[in-house]
Amino acid sequence: MGDVMNKYFVVISLLLPLLSGCSEKPQSGELQKLPVDINAGKAIAQKNCSGCHGMDGRGVQDNIPNLAAQIDTYLLKAAQTYDHGKRAGSSGDVMKIAKDLSPIQLRSVLGYYASLPPLGNLGNKSANYSYFDRGEALSKPCAACHGADGNQTSAGVPRLAGQHPQYIVKAAKAYRDGTRTMPAMHEKLTALSQADLENIAIYFALNKPKAVASKVANPYAGKQFTNQCAKCHGSMGSSEDASVPNLAGQDVNYLNTKIKSYRDKMRDHGEMHKILSELKDNEIEKIAIFFAAEQPTQTNFIPPEPITALAQKCDLCHNIGNTNPAMLTPKLKGQNHTYLINAMTAYRDGDRGSSAMHKISSGLYLDATIEGIATHYSAEAAN
């Protein structure tokens, strides 16, 4: 996160001018001019489409989009992208069904789904999404060791409050995925998604780190050994690199143990091993005492823009289709939560073709932001 996440605001602000043109013009052709036969479309839906989209237009499984009351010109455009192979990867061979329909059949079945009433929400989700609040809830299992706010009270445990969120995510993923070995950490993290880890990291990063008074008479005796450390971690243990942890004010036992583990190759990090390989135990202990005695500083991380503010920008295009059929953008309210996440992720990662959405979604660095937008819209009443 850090610098990457701080760029988030810049990217979003630069994208605002693009929002006015975020849908493509309808393709010319005869398909849109064909008459719609709702009864014929219903019969086609029963035979070809209901297995996935239901007769009521609700996806029968997670990640299948709801089609009921969707804008018919958008449905037509989407079906054409499948027919032209632009979305083959998102549904595999499933949408080859659309290729087997005649133009009049396709027009009618899409007209049928567009004519259906909006669907009611099945879930009881709130449209409100707060990175901090969600991170606080998800971090409950961390509190026993790291403290409820990330200020630990146990010896040998790192303080997470005020730490760079990008580093917290990186370290948590290493424990979750097993590249760092600690069974207790792996057990607590194994079920957490990337978005979950980001929310937890944001929560801890925004909490104020508490200083602990040093009990050592001369804590600065170790500064002479920290010249190489300072290049990455800062001269006083506060790093400007968001991927590198702050050491200032960390627990002395934790620092002592981890620095030795890098020196002894118990943790894999070539550069750290190279720097530490010649240091003796007592020298590392002095380094740990020095950094532990420094006052911790809070990361300069800027929180992501609130989801409600981002949704207002999305609405500039995705609400206008109700009154302007030329805007080929889908309705998002009440849409399937997982489908929205996967669709936005595909646009962000370049796996779906839409130049406008690529530009807009490229600003969504965080999976948590995508999850938040999906939560916002899926919880709203369909229209």
Regions found by a protein language model. Give the residues of each.
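Positively charged n-region of N-terminal signal peptides that target proteins for export
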Residues: 2-8
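Extended non-catalytic domains of envelope/secretory-pathway proteins
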Residues: 144-146, 159, 164-167, 195-199, ...
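The canonical Cys-X-X-Cys-His
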Residues: 49-55, 109, 113, 139-149, ...
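C-terminal capping alpha-helices of c-type cytochrome domains
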Residues: 97-122, 190-212, 277-300, 347, ...
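Electrostatic cytochrome c docking/interface patches
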Residues: 23-45, 60-63, 114-139, 153-156, ...
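Gly/Gly-Pro-rich "capping" loops immediately C-terminal to redox-active cysteine motifs
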Residues: 42, 57-84, 132, 150-176, ...
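C-terminal motif of bacterial Sec signal peptides marking the signal peptidase cleavage site
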Residues: 18-21
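C-terminal functional regions that serve as terminal interaction/effector modules
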Residues: 254, 266, 281-284, 294, ...
